[in-house]
Amino acid sequence: MLYSLLYGYFNINLFQYLTFRAGLGFFIAFFLTLFLMPKFILWAKAKKANQPISSFVPSHQNKKDTPTMGGIVFVFATIVASVLCASLGNLYVLLGIIVLVGFSFVGFRDDYTKINQQNNAGMSAKMKFGMLFVLSLVVSVLLSLKGLDTFLYAPFLKNPLFEMPTMLAVGFWMLVFLSTSNAVNLTDGLDGLASVPSIFTLLSLSIFVYVAGNAEFSKYLLYPKVIDVGELFVVSLALVGSLFGFLWYNCNPASVFMGDSGSLALGGFIAYNAIVSHNEILLVLMGSIFVVETLSVILQVGSYKTRKKRLFLMAPIHHHFEQKGWAENKVIVRFWIISMLSNLVALLSLKVR
C-alpha cells in the first residue's frame, strides 16, 4: 500500500529499495506487536483462553493461567506490515501471506478446541493433518503453476542434484510444509524455545531469498536465481520483527504463549521460504533444533512400540533435559546457541560452493 502510493504515484525513490522497505516492515511489525500484545493478554485472560498444561509435566503447572494464541497477534502484525511495505502484485508475497493465514487458522482451530475442552489434545489428528495436507497441496500446486523450477539443490554445491518431475516436486514440497510446520509445533514447549530458533532460521532464509531475487548477487555467488522472489524478503523481515515483539512477552517467565496459531504459521512460512529459495535440504541444518525435537518424538514412539522401552525420560527432547534436572532457562539458551551456530554454518554455503 505505502509502496504503491509513495513510489508508484509520488515517485519517492526511497521506497524502490527492497532493503529500506524490509527494514520499515520490520519496525512496523515489531512496534505493532508490542502495542497489541498487552491488550490481547488482558482479553485472553478475561476469556480464560489459557493453555491447558499436560499432567506429565508437573513443573509447568504454574503456567496454567498463562494465555495462549499469541501467534494471532504476530501473524496479524506481519500481515499489516507486509500490506504497507511489500508489493501486493507479487505472487510470492501473496502466497506467503496465504501460508501465514492458512496455517495460523489451522492452529487457531486446534487452540480453540484445547481451550474449549480444557485438555491438551486439541483437534483429532486426522482433522488437523487433513487441513494441513489440503493447505500444503494448494500452495505447492500454485507454486508449480507459477513456474517455480523443480531443481533440487544441496548445500555447498553450485549445480543442482537433479530436476524433479512436477508431480514429485509437488509431493516433496508438501512434505516440507507438513514436516516443518509440525516440527516447529513440537518445539514450542518452553518459553521462547520456538520463537528464537525461528528468528535465526527466518533471518538466514531471508538472506537466501534476497540473493535469489537479485540478479547480480545470485550471479556472483553462483546461486540459483528466482525471478521476483526478492519481494518476499519484506514479508520475512516483517515476521522477524513481530517475533521480536512477541519475544518481549514470551521470554521466561512467559506472559503469553504463541499456541498452535503461531507455531504452525511459523513452520509453514519457514517451509515456504526454504522451498522458493531452493533450500529444502539446507533447512535440515538451519532448523536443526526443530529436526532434533521431531526425531526425539519419532524415536521415542518407535522404541516404545517395538521394544516397550523409552529412549528418553520424556519427549520432545527439551522435556528430557528438564527431567534430568536442567533449569528451563538453561535448556532454552543452550538450544538457542545450537540454532544460532547451525544457521551461521548454513550461511557459509552462500560463498562456499
UniProtKB/Swiss-Prot annotation:
Coiled coil: none
The organism's place on the tree of life at top rank: Bacteria
Location in the cell: Cell inner membrane
InterPro entries the record matches: Glycosyl_transferase_4 (IPR000715), PNAcMuramoyl-5peptid_Trfase (IPR003524), PNAcMuramoyl-5peptid_Trfase_CS (IPR018480)
Enzyme class: transferase
Ranges that cross the membrane: 24-44, 66-86, 88-108, 129-149, 160-180, 192-212, 229-249, 256-276, 281-301, 330-350
Topology of this chain in the membrane: Multi-pass membrane protein
Phosphoprotein keyword on record: no
Catalytic function, reaction form: UDP-N-acetyl-alpha-D-muramoyl-L-alanyl-gamma-D-glutamyl-meso-2,6-diaminopimeloyl-D-alanyl-D-alanine + di-trans,octa-cis-undecaprenyl phosphate = di-trans,octa-cis-undecaprenyl diphospho-N-acetyl-alpha-D-muramoyl-L-alanyl-D-glutamyl-meso-2,6-diaminopimeloyl-D-alanyl-D-alanine + UMP
Pathway recorded for this protein: Cell wall biogenesis; peptidoglycan biosynthesis
Keyword Transcription found: no
Family of the protein in this entry: Belongs to the glycosyltransferase 4 family. MraY subfamily.
Protein name per UniProt: Phospho-N-acetylmuramoyl-pentapeptide-transferase
Source organism per UniProt: Helicobacter pylori (strain P12)
